[in-house]
Amino acid sequence: EIISNVCASVEEILKPKTIALITDTRKSSEVISSWISEGFSHNVEILNYGVLPSGSMPILLNELNHDMGIIISASHNPSEYNGIKLIDKNGSKLLDDGENLSEENMDDIQLPENDSSIKNYHLGYESYKKFINSINDIDFSNFDLLIDSANGSVFKIIKEIVPEIVRKMTQIAKKQNGQNSNEE
């Protein structure tokens, strides 16, 4: 209920028309997505780009021209602490003033009668991959890398990008199951 109320408050204050959504690998991302949908009205288009690293959000906002972004993540905390991070259209965490306004407004907020729907959209994966591949001012071709994916959101994309630019890559903690992010 809190997440839905925060989203309704954000809509009332910031009036976004399009929102980029990315998630981590935790199973709770699905239920949190539904709470986000309940909080925004049908006037807000939410595009779910799926499991991507948090650092991809500024790229998505810039490349795909969204009004704001939402990241579902517990960062480096256990799964039970999964929640949302609100990101402004410039790719920065929503300023504390905006957070304070939405918190003050939450007591009076009513959830919309017609929820927004979340559309799955996979262009974000390719946009992020293209951006990472465009970083070519460092020559990694003589590097052997060990990458700890922490069973998190980087587990999939890293194995597509890194082998192309390094001599040898070994990836560990790459078997996410929805509950083991940041575990060995």
Task: Indicate residue ranges for each PLM-predicted region.
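Generic hydrophobic secondary-structure packing signal
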Residues: 2-3, 65
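N-terminal small/polar loop signature for handling phosphorylated ligands or for N-terminal nucleophile
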Residues: 18-81, 161-184
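Nucleotide donor/acceptor-binding cores
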Residues: 16-19, 142-144
